[in-house]
Amino acid sequence: MGARVTRALRNFNVEKRAEREISKRKPSMAPKHPSTRDLLQEHRSQYPEIEEVVSKKDNKLLSLLRDVYVDSKDPVPALPVKVEPRQEPKEFRLPIGNHFDKNITDIPKGKITVVEALTLLNNHKLSPETWTAEKIAQEYYLELKDVNSLLKYFVTFEVKILPPEDRKAIQSK
C-alpha cells in the first residue's frame, strides 16, 4: 500500500513540473576578466568576419556528418582469459621476545621508539620527582608539550596479583 501512495505522489503533476524545469533560465557564463574582455573586443573589431563564420552553418560539413555511420562491436578475444583465484597474503608475525626492535637503528631527534616510551613512562611512574617532564624532554630531545601529553594520557599497565587469602574471602554465589 505504501508504494502505491508514494508512486502517486511522485507522478503527481509530472508534466507541469517538467515544463517548469525546462522553462527555467539557463545559467549564464562566468564573467570574463576585464583584461580578457578588452582583448576580445579589440579582436572582434579588427576581424568582424570571424563572428559570421563561426555562427554560419557549413552545409558541406553537415552532409559529411550525416554520412558517418558508427558500428562498434567488441573484439572476440583470441585466447580465453583465465581467472585465477586470488592468493591470500601469507601470515606475518613478529618474532617472540623483546628483540624485535633490533632493526631500528636510526631514530631522528624528537621521536622515540615504543620501548623508550614505555621506559620513560615507567621511570616517571616509579619516581616522578626525579623523572619530571622537563628532564624527560631534555633526555629524549622531545618537546615539553608532547611529554606533558604523553604523561597525562598514557599509562603503563599495572598487574596486581591477589594473594591466596584474599581469594578465600570472596564467596561464590
Curated annotation (Swiss-Prot):
It is found in: Mitochondrion; Membrane. A lipid is attached at residue 2 (N-myristoyl glycine). One of its GO terms (molecular function) is calmodulin binding. It is a lipid-anchor. Residues 16-40 are annotated as: Disordered. GO terms for biological process: defense response to virus; mitochondrial respiratory chain complex I assembly; NADH dehydrogenase complex assembly. It comes from the Eukaryota. Keywords: Calmodulin-binding, Lipoprotein, Membrane, Mitochondrion, Myristate, Phosphoprotein. One of its GO terms (cellular component) is mitochondrial membrane. Phosphorylated on serine. Prolactin stimulate serine phosphorylation. The modification Phosphoserine is found at residue 35. Belongs to the NDUFAF4 family. May be involved in cell proliferation and survival of hormone-dependent tumor cells. Involved in the assembly of mitochondrial NADH:ubiquinone oxidoreductase complex (complex I). PANTHER family: NADH DEHYDROGENASE [UBIQUINONE] 1 ALPHA SUBCOMPLEX ASSEMBLY FACTOR 4, UPF0240 PROTEIN. Binds calmodulin. Interacts with NDUFAF3. This is NADH dehydrogenase [ubiquinone] 1 alpha subcomplex assembly factor 4. It comes from Mus musculus. The gene is Ndufaf4.
